[in-house]
Amino acid sequence: MDPKRSQKESVLITGGSGYFGFRLGCALNQNGVHVILFDISSPAQTIPEGIKFIQGDIRHLSDVEKAFQDADVTCVFHIASYGMSGREQLNRNLIKEVNVRGTDNILQVCQRRRVPRLVYTSTFNVIFGGQVIRNGDESLPYLPLHLHPDHYSRTKSIAEQKVLEANATPLDRGDGVLRTCALRPAGIYGPGEQRHLPRIVSYIEKGLFKFVYGDPRSLVEFVHVDNLVQAHILASEALRADKGHIASGQPYFISDGRPVNNFEFFRPLVEGLGYTFPSTRLPLTLVYCFAFLTEMVHFILGRLYNFQPFLTRTEVYKTGVTHYFSLEKAKKELGYKAQPFDLQEAVEWFKAHGHGRSSGSRDSECFVWDGLLVFLLIIAVLMWLPSSVILSL
């Protein structure tokens, strides 16, 4: 945001305690913007001076209203969501409550409190559902809701459409209209990221990263947290009158703009921590069967022990099937310029926090995980073989 007018700016960030939300808040704060972080739990990091944290549950309208009480908010960055990966993907009720009801609450309060701008953090998944997409753009239709392989993607699609349909909604007392846009980021990475990278490192350290899968030519995309911060700030500016409200009612794909094989992207992390990158490659359909089994085990045992599934079916598609998108619209309308980044920062972060291969022997837990992994893979092979035979006939 323009520092010359940042004194007048007061923004509210839902999901502000999360990795990306906190990073965005710090960047805006450095520009002199008054920042309010709204989340169900407080940030793990020290909150810088000038940033206010308000604890609350986005599912409760009264909590959302309280977050707006003491500030004349001029822009909301709606980042809060639930169910992106792992065991969270299997909690359908909570996913809907946070992603859909939470968005309804935000839109309602924005209208009441006469907030002129709302930037929604969406996902590639509103378009992608396991089909190959090469250099897709924003003209692609939404994936039909019943075709989404997971509830997170389905609810994010519903929420994005609600946000964009709310564009130009009159604010209370006839005080202007609400301008909205949606950013669809690829998978986020960066030093200190707490969702995807720690899970991957945990698998590496437990000796579970034994294979890759799918076509080695398959391509996906990622976005560094700082590029995503840049895109959100630009989007909020592009909703202004002096920018011709160019982003008003529009979606934008956001990534680093460098399609890459999913497993090759993570090779520097594996080898940088001193581990051997696996050479075994399995068929995508076999791993999909394996993921189905882990989901079934979680369904049966999850109430007794809410363990982290090794993989979900959606994660298999997202990592093993080609899907990447053009940045032309974001470049042209927002002025977005992706900066070059890699995983080296993340490698150094993990090393600084005690991760990396040591010279000691593997502990007994690794052998237990090995046994469970082999057992599930054998069952997956038995499930997969009949279907592979049928396909070959």
UniProtKB/Swiss-Prot annotation:
SUPFAM superfamilies: NAD(P)-binding Rossmann-fold domains (SSF51735). It is found in: Membrane. One of its GO terms (molecular function) is oxidoreductase activity, acting on the CH-OH group of donors, NAD or NADP as acceptor. It is a multi-pass membrane protein. It comes from the Eukaryota. Pfam families: 3Beta_HSD. The keyword NAD applies. Its EC number is 1.1.1.-. The active site is at Y152 (proton acceptor). GO terms for cellular component: membrane. Changing R154Q: Found in two patients with genital anomalies and features compatible with Brittle cornea syndrome; uncertain significance. One of its GO terms (biological process) is steroid biosynthetic process. Belongs to the 3-beta-HSD family. This is Short-chain dehydrogenase/reductase family 42E member 1. It comes from Homo sapiens (Human). The lineage of its organism: Eukaryota, Metazoa, Chordata, Craniata, Vertebrata.
